[in-house]
């Protein structure tokens, strides 16, 4: 690796699983000290051990991104451990696949509190430290193709990711004067647990639905979590020093086909 993040400290919320773990692992391989902010202590510690075994530096901290005290404490603990904060990846998220006529308000609150509230809280406390440091920083929000592309039974999840897209633009405008860049990545069909769960819920034949989704993608394949880690590294590094307020679609070209599920 090229050590593009040598000496930097990065927080990845939801960093112990799936896309979050791929990003955290890539950052650590590039020289960053990575904090894995995860609700599950066991998952966080397992991810920390995996990164350390691979030669990286990582620390798992328990955090509920929907709880302000928990987020504030996690950022404070990061500073206690490493003395600085350069990158925040607001990756933690959740979803629900419900038809709007059957929507549970409890599900609505859970999705919005985590997907929208978690981004706002993480940005609030990370940006405070980045501002004080005078070094600026990079905040990366993990959105979704569903924030720009209609999919079935996704009103709440899609709405939450649409909000993330606008929050990204607004906070980029608010924080640019402090040298803090804010960008978002919108993954498309990523071959992971969340994507398979979605199709199991909304389709009677999930295997056929996934095959149809694959066929609608210009590049002809589902994405991998590593396909998201690479763009995240770009946005975290100085290679993207003049990039802010941007939504990067990482979807293999699926957005060119309109609604695809």
Can you annotate each of these PLM segments?
Residues 9, 16-18:
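Conserved glycine-rich cofactor-binding loop
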Residues 89, 176, 181, 243-245:
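Short, small/polar-rich loop/turn modules that mediate ligand/substrate recognition or access, typified
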Residues 99-100, 107-112, 213:
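Substrate-binding pocket helix/loop in short-chain dehydrogenase/reductase
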């Amino acid at each position: 690796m090229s050590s593009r993040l040598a000496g930097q400290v990065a927080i990845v919320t939801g960093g112990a699983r799936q896309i979050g773990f791929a990003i955290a692992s890539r950052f650590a391989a590039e020289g960053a000290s990575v904090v894995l902010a995860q609700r599950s202590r066991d998952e966080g510690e397992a991810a920390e051990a995996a990164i350390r075994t691979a030669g990286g530096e990582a620390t798992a901290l328990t955090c509920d991104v929907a709880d302000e005290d928990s987020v504030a404490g996690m950022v404070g603990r990061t500073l206690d451990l490493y003395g600085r904060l350069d990158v925040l990846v607001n990756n933690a998220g959740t979803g629900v696949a419900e038809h709007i006529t059957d929507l549970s308000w409890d599900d609505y609150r859970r999705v919005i509190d985590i997907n929208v509230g978690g981004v706002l809280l993480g940005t609030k406390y990370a940006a405070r430290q980045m501002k004080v440091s005078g070094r600026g920083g990079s905040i990366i929000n993990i959105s979704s193709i569903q924030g720009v592309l209609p999919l079935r039974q996704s009103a709440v999840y899609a709405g939450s990711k649409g909000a993330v897209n606008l929050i990204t633009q607004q906070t980029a405008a608010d924080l640019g004067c402090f040298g803090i860049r804010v960008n978002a990545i919108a993954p498309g069909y990523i071959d992971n647990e969340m994507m398979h769960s979605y199709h199991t819920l909304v389709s009677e034949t999930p295997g056929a639905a996934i095959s149809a989704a694959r066929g609608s993608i210009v590049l002809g394949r589902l994405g991998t979590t590593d396909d998201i880690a690479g763009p995240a590294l770009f946005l975290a590094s100085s290679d993207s020093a003049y990039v802010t307020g941007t939504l990067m679609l990482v979807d293999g070209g699926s957005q060119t086909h309109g609604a695809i599920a």
